[in-house]
Amino acid sequence: MIRERREAYRDARLIVIASEGKDTERIYFKALAKEYTNPRVHVHILERSEDERNNSSPEHVLKQLNNYKNQYELEADDELWLVVDKDRWTDAMLSRVATECTQEVSMHMALSNPCFELWLLLHIEDSALLTPEEQKQWMENRRKSKNADPYLKVRLRQKMGSYHESSYDALALIAHVEDAIERARALDKNPADRWPQTLGTRVY
C-alpha cells in the first residue's frame, strides 16, 4: 500500500503524540500546542477509537504509533512520542517498548514515574521542597481506599481547586510550564537511563 502524505502541513516538522491515558494527556498537549503555536512545527495527538479506549498498555500505545508511521510518509525530522506511565507496568514490558523505540530514530519514549499527574503537579509544586516522607507518598501514589483516587490526583485537586482526568484547566498549568521543565530536569538524576527509576518524568 502506498503511504499517504499529510500535505496540509508538510512544510512543518511533525510531532505525533500517542499516550496511555484516555483524556488527561490529550487535554494537556492540545492546550500546549494551542498556546505555543509555531508555523514550523505541527503537533498531532492521536485519538483512540472506542474499541481502543480500554487498552492502555505501553505496547498498545507503541502499536498505535507504528500504525501511524506505516500509514503516513514521514520526513527525517518528524518525531513520534510515546507518553506512558510506570505505574503497574513491569520493567520487562517497558524494556521491550524502550528497545523498539531506540531502534527507530524518530521514536521517543517519555515515561513518568509513577504517572503523568506528576508532570502536571510539577507545574505548581516543587518536589525538591518535599520532605522524604512526602516524596515517598508521591512515588507510591497510593489510594486511601479502594474507590478513592490515587494520591497525586488528590494532590492536584487540592492545589488546583478542581481536577478530574477528563476535565481540568490545562492552560492554568501551562502558564508555569517552564517551572515544570526545570523541576523535572532536577528530578532526573540519571538521564542516561531509558526511563526514570525513581520519582521523575521525561515529559520535559
Segments and roles (model prediction):
Residues 1-12, 27-51, 69-81, 85-204:
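C-terminal accessory helical subdomains adjacent to catalytic cores in phosphodiester-
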Residues 14-18:
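Conserved beta-strand elements of the Class I
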Residues 21-25, 53-62, 198-202:
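Phosphate/oxyanion-binding active-site loops and adjacent basic polyanion-contact surfaces
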Residues 63-68:
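Alpha-helical scaffolding within the catalytic cores
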